[in-house]
Amino acid sequence: MPDRAGCVGLLHETFLQTNPSPLSSTSKRLALILSAAVAGFTLAQFVARQNGAPSWWPDRDRDRQARYFKEVLQLVKENYVGDAPADYASLTRSALDGMVAQLDPHSAFMLADEYRETEEEMTNAFTGVGIQVEQRDNQVVIIAPIPGTPAERAGVRRNDRLVKIDGQPLATPTLAATIKLVRGEPGSLVTLTVYRPSQSKTIDYPLRREKIRLESVRLATLRPGQIGYLQITQFSERTGEEFASALAGLEKSGLRALIIDLRNNPGGLLDAAIAVCSQFFDQDELIMYTQGRTPETRDNHYAPGGHRARHYPVAILVNGGTASAAEIVAGAMRDTKRAVIVGEKTFGKGSVQSVIELDNGEGLRLTTARYYTPSGITIHEKGIAPQVEFEVSPDDEARLRIQQARPDLSVAPEDDFKPITDLQLAAAEEVLTGVLAAKGR
């Protein structure tokens, strides 16, 4: 448990300072902070520029390369004698897939059905087993199983490496291809084979696919000392509305301080993260900004009006499964001294993916920007270090997830399951109790 005197000092610095000065202009753009299987839409616009080059030069170079591609495409189509598909459509799709996949792990060319699934996820419903994944070092890593889903119920854990699907090894895996293999009809079976680094063993999980309906804000409760608690599982279209409603309910019950649990939250929509932060920011105050490849692509995101900013003490719980849009919330709240961060270092995904529908119904997911906290800090590949660090073992984390997902532990599959104390949550409560005492509340 953290030292009380140290926590009070930290919280005094965090919460008892003057709020930052609000900024004046407002900018709003639908964007996406993508984590693995979570996706959404944005409109991306680019200005082609080269230092000192004529304005027509980029088009000339593009056309030259297009002619080169056309020449190779025709040669393959007319002369290839192997078994692989060599029609123009197949060759073009393979070329596009390879072109985008080599950029970074988050960019991808999507066929029409993959694009529709991406759309579906942001409506809080899709068919699968309930895992959210990330490509890392040519491996598919499970960021977190979604609470209450087949994967979570079976015991799949954060940081498991997905190595086989239905017995087939994932050779040079891509996220899009992996997700397509995991998805399927409701009620159908799929076996995931994972390697668990913490135990140095491989485990098979036979799972039955089902319709996954995501409740992004859950477990809103008032704990002892009138400290509110709620969990955000991901950031989707309705998260801002659900969060505001949960806050209002807790406040009616006498809320004095708040714990926001972002552990194992893989991210989601940028607009949803902005909506959550805006509950604590004054109108027109900068929450975060994104920066593309040229200076004019900076896009500031400010708090909208229409509601009062909350100024009670806040603690945010994070761990290695906290990624992307969830890191935006943690970073913005910490950067502006509106919250203290408790737990473990976050994942470190600070890139923005734009999802663009193509004319034929297929899609392109492309990394177009990095995001930054109000003071200009990026967490990409760095993560956010908590101010109150408190690590939990993988075994204890798995047990805690069972407790959160299924309060009725009689349905837990593990034999002799015994509830355990959430020490990270207890640490956050200790911190907030200290700041409430320091403020005389």
What is the predicted function of each stretch?
Residues 19-20, 60-61, 65, 79, ...:
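Cleft-lining beta-strand/loop regions that shape enzyme active-site pockets
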Residues 77-143, 189-191, 195-219, 423-432, ...:
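Extended, small/polar residue-biased N-terminal targeting/export presequences
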Residues 363, 370-441:
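Conserved functional hotspot residues or short segments at active or partner-binding sites
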Residues 15-107, 140, 431, 435-441:
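Terminal targeting/pro-maturation regions of precursor/exported proteins
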Residues 72, 95, 131, 192, ...:
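Residue-level signature of catalytic and energy-coupling elements of molecular machines
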